[in-house]
């Protein structure tokens, strides 16, 4: 069985599923390339192009016209890489057996934040190869779920909601406790997993404020 982790604020572009089927083999995970409005900095792993941030302003017709132009035409979709790259970010497609083999998502991070980085690390340690196809894409409005959702008390689409900030802090501390470091990846979103050592600090005259600062 093939499954996919997919965000609610993503729009599947033509040919995306065909590209997944082309590249998905045993012990691989295939990510689609994200086309995003410029809410976050640009990077070598995605395409910045503004076709709307909110569903109500989504310019679907303009997006499809831009995307379906020949790749060598002026003003159309231009992949940043000629060949698939090695990285992982939503949406990602995988075989159900590979997901079950590592126990799925760790409930430590429920309801959200850092659960994706955690499972990416575990996939990599279990021998999974990551493939990002540049022939298959999604349009990603970004942060329309909870992070910058004004319905969830975010002041605007450029500021994180209080609920997301609090949960992100909890999940970040749990990630550091589990892995011994903060989330790390290369410029193309392939996980970097440093070695973890059994170390500790002995404190004298301790208090809760100091413990909170030193122990994640």
Can you describe what each PLM-predicted range is?
Residues 2-11:
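Short beta-strand-to-loop acidic/aromatic patch adjacent to the donor-nucleotide binding site
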Residues 7, 140-142:
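Histidine-centered active-site/metal-ligand motif
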Residues 8, 34-35, 135:
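Active-site loop/turn elements of alpha/beta-hydrolase fold enzymes
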Residues 10-12, 37, 110, 118:
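A short, conserved beta-strand element in the Rossmann-like catalytic core
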Residues 15-32:
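Conserved donor-nucleotide/metal-binding helix-loop-beta segment in metal-dependent transferases, i.e.
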Residues 15-19, 118-122, 170, 174:
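Alpha-helical elements of Rossmann-like donor-binding domains used by nucleotide-donor carbohydrate transfer enzymes
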Residues 20, 86-94, 98-103, 109-137:
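A short, conserved alpha-helix in the catalytic core of glycosyltransferases
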Residues 29-84, 90-93, 129-130, 146-212, ...:
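C-terminal, non-catalytic tails of nucleotide-sugar-dependent glycosyltransferases
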């Amino acid at each position: 069985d093939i499954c996919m982790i997919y965000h609610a604020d993503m729009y599947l572009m033509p040919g995306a599923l065909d590209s997944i089927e082309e590249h998905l083999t045993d012990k691989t995970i295939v990510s689609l390339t994200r086309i995003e409005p410029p809410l976050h900095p640009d990077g070598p792993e995605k395409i910045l192009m503004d076709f709307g941030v909110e569903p109500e302003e989504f310019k679907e017709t303009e997006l499809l016209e831009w995307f379906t132009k020949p790749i060598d035409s002026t003003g159309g979709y231009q992949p940043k890489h000629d060949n698939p790259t090695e990285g992982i970010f939503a949406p990602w497609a995988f075989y159900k057996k590979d997901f079950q083999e590592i126990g799925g998502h760790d409930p430590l991070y429920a309801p959200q934040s850092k659960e994706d980085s955690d499972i990416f690390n575990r996939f990599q340690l279990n021998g999974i190869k990551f493939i990002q196809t540049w022939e298959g894409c999604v349009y990603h409005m970004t942060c329309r779920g909870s992070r910058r959702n004004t319905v969830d008390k975010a002041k605007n689409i450029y500021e994180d909601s209080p609920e997301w900030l609090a949960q992100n802090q909890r999940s970040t501390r749990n990630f550091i406790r589990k892995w011994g470091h903060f989330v790390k990846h290369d410029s193309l979103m392939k996980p970097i997993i440093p070695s973890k050592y059994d170390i500790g600090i002995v404190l004298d005259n301790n208090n809760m404020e100091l413990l909170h600062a030193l122990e994640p």
